[in-house]
Amino acid sequence: METVPARSSKDAPIENVDRNIVSEEMKLICRQVGISRIYSHQEEAIRRARTGESVVVSTPTASGKSLCYIIPILEKIMSEPNARALLMYPLKALANNQAESFQKFIEAAKRVVAARQNGFTDNVNLGKISRLANCQIKVCDGDSDAREKAEIRAGNTNRIIITNPDSLHWMLPQHASWGKKFFGNLSLIVLDEAHIFHGIMGSNVALLFRRLIRVCNNYGNPTPEFICTSATIRNPSEHVKALTTRNTSSVAESGAPSGDKRFMLWQPAELKLSSKGGGEVSTDDPVAEMKTRKSPNHEAAVFIADLAKNGIRCLCFVESRAQCESVKREVRTILNKDNCLHLSNKIESYRGGYSRAERRELERRLQSNQICALVCTSALEMGIDVGSLDATVHVGVPETSSSLLQQAGRAGRRHGTSLAVVIARENPIDAYYCDKYEELFKRPPEEAFIDPQNEALLTLHLPCAAKELCFDLDSLEFDREMFDLDEDDVAKRKKKYKKLNVEEIFAAKEKVEENLTPFNAALKKLTHKTEITPIAPLMFDNPTNTLRFDKRCEVNPHSAVLLRGNPFGDGWWLVLKPKEGYNGINYEQLLQTPETQAMLEKRKLLVECIDSDRALMRLYVGAIHTTREGTYEVKKIDAMKRIAFCEEYAWNGLATMPKVNENITILDTSVVENCAVRYNRNVLNTRVSLGNVRVEEFVQGYNRFRVTSAEGGKSVSQVEFETPLVCANYRTKSLFFSLPEDVLNKIPSENVFAAILGVRNVCVELASSIAFCSRKDVSSAMKFSNDPPNSKCVIFIYDCCPNGVGLSDKLFECAELLLEKAAYLVKNCPCERGCPLCICSGRGGGRAAGAKKIVKMMLDCMTTV
């Protein structure tokens, strides 16, 4: 048990705040909405924003961060007749929640205006308040249809627009329809939950913001300022500057109160399994053999049921959608058995894949205290209003300290004691923290890494920028400010870069030039034809001396940009196909169209829309799929149409888990035949290569396992497919270490696998800090073979995105740094046998536990010349 002590409030009456920070008009409106006091961090953030600074507020969950941008925006609206604001949220639920918050202030302004017109007077400027009363706030995102979007663009009083990065990406090519009215008067841009925009997604969003600023500059508005909110990370100011280009001041010390928070780390009890004859279980099933403790899902369900019976409202965080539905079902089962039917229907689930109407209804019930426990994925980790909660339950140790604090912060949002129960799963990392629980709460905040100068991403975004506004070659300096390296970037990369002038960019591309800045290299690549791209995306227009997007290109450049890094095409549909057929629907001819979707939803036949990213890991034939409405078994899949057909399934406490395998193949034979030094070199005492690989992930079959009762997780049966189902097959870039025999011979044969696994784990863990990406942007594999020559093993670290986005290139360039950092980290980690902070991190990391000395020996061999 760990206790985070209560924190007292640092606040002041809003009346006492300097009028240059909060105007008299704003104070009056705040009183109308029930705000009489303001926290110290809110006052500081508002002060900085109102003096023209860009600000990032990184105080804890439930500290009132939204007021830090609501008040500056409303002050702008009141004081500047044409001012506009743009707010971006990562989740639709957050957007709608905040629209309601803004609307409360607008309604209060209307009441003030009405009261003053009826003879009441105050020492305020009624004209300013009238501007706010007439202000419209609009949500423009994927849920808005074409008619709604056209009305939003046309409205003169639509001064606050709420959207998300995905929708903004498609707003920019239509900037002329928004015009100077919006982009020319855009004063403040808000980015909520900035910490989640890291890695490839964050780098994409950073380039999106540069395109946004470029459009604003076109309308005479080069300096819109940013207000960002973030969870606790190690580098909030640096991260937001990299995202927005703006020098940013950080407000991190919270003035909001919080009650005691008790963290409890719970390790499920060991199971005493026995056969029906009374003896010990003996099984050839490795999954069953590994399950020696009670199911964490079952333990979570017991905790939630007990909390509900004691009137304690809670959230339960789980990893997957299937787990979400399973835990909810088990909680209801427990409550029904205990004759608590009045509580059973107040247990709900919340996850991705629900319809807009379902999400809104759940949010409404949650905020009005009609739900006593909600089982959810990370979709609720971020700050929509969840009402008054007393506890959180976490199935598994959250991956980062920020996630744990964000999730636990959803309960006990102001006063009183709250509880966070972390239930350990049966894996080495969770077991490690059960042995050394104090380390769980001492984990340092993580850094957020992005790279807006990633050359591969620039080659995607620069054509978008050129289509939005051509590059004026007579005045390219502003574009260089947006997209090129600045002095700090060059110093950080410790490399001499060459910047090209306009003539050099268009010079004949006779050879690959070394040390070009990423912006110059991307421009040079985009203005020259190749065998793959016979029409260069960017063309020179001599009469205007501009660089334009070539409309002859078949691909719309905006379609080529995948902001969230999901490269696997459109999503899948799971469609209910009753055994007897249904009202004449021809299932064989179903196509994914809006009309078909509306028809299926009306008849309640569209079970779920599923994201495309490895959807077949969930939609193989035989898969059991649970939703809020029921349980279904997948009977058929149509890969061409991306539709899976299912039937209703009489749930019997079983679920399915795919048996996934992976294969990685080197495609560049020249790499392993010692071709150019650029792609194959000796680094310290290790052979390091860079090349193209093919990654295949496939489902070989599945396990049926029991999810109810304390023995949840026990395998019941296994199914093998005659032909494995390919769920991902793509070409990408990879860095690989060839470990020669003389290195492996120094390691005892029984320890070789654990040693190589430990080396892989620590290198992948460090890759994000070197390639400025997220842990999820790179993956790894090991392959034992005789290829490349003289090597028994190859460690691969590859880009998870098809065709790669330059991460492996960066790692190859910095291979010495990567290996030296790995050796230093293992040597200086205070653990004795290996821990999640060194060799036991990541997928399968626990199998390296106990091998620290061997890993250290191997890294010493690899780095000693």
Residue ranges of each PLM-predicted region?
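Donor-sugar nucleotide-binding helix/loop cap in glycosyltransferases
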Residues: 497
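Short, non-ligating residues that shape and space the ligands of small metal-coordination modules
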Residues: 844
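Short cysteine clusters
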Residues: 829-838
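Cys/His-rich metal-chelating microdomains
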Residues: 841
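Helicase motor core with emphasis on the C-terminal RecA-like subdomain
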Residues: 1-33, 37-40, 44, 50-66, ...
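ATPase nucleotide-binding modules
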Residues: 476-479, 503
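Extended Lys/Arg-rich polyanion-binding regions
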Residues: 418-420, 426-443, 451, 456-464, ...
